[in-house]
Amino acid sequence: MYDRDGVVTSTGTRVGANQSGYGADIGIPMIENQWDIFVEEAVLSNYGSGLSAGTRYKFSEMFDAKFAYQVLSNQFVPAYFNSTYEDSPVNLSSISNESKSGYFGSLGANLMDYFRFEGTYQSYTTASGLKSNTVLASLGMKEMQNVSLVASYAQPNFAGLSSLSADNATIKADVSYRLNSYSKAIIHYSKVYVTSTSVQESYATEISFELPVKF
């Protein structure tokens, strides 16, 4: 995948210009269309790579799960080009993580073909021996009645239920309203729990234009 122009954030910063990435996924089906084991590798040009091996299981059309062991180089962001890329892009140049390895587990749910919820737990050890536990949650809503939603929660320093609203836990939400075929209005919301008693909130609005291009 290649993004020539990048994405302009609500603060006016252009993120991801000339960024490319590629990946490979080898899966071995254990139960057709339900359970497989896999090996994945992804590379972000100039920003490292990630290797993952694990298993995926689909309980039904509604629920699914994934468990894997991962090895990630510094500055690599898994799922960088995901469904939230246009609304909430990650500035790779601001990432200064150490290389790390550890376990990843997620549970997902699809509701009425419009909603997707996913909860994730990660436990990593860095190259220097530091351990970290991260809890992530995301909710996406496809465009319905001209409205779409992307919301996320992240706690990079998870240490039990008491840490869910402390230690840099972050809530983000982007609500989009389609004005016409070529533009939409977006409200960005962010809330950061610096400590259990200190909270930072911010709002921003923008108009996004989409120009159809045919080749």
What positions do the PLM features span?
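Predominantly the C-terminal beta-signal and adjacent terminal strand-loop region
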Residues: 73-90, 172-215
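Signature for the C-terminal beta-barrel architecture of outer-membrane proteins
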Residues: 1-169, 200-202
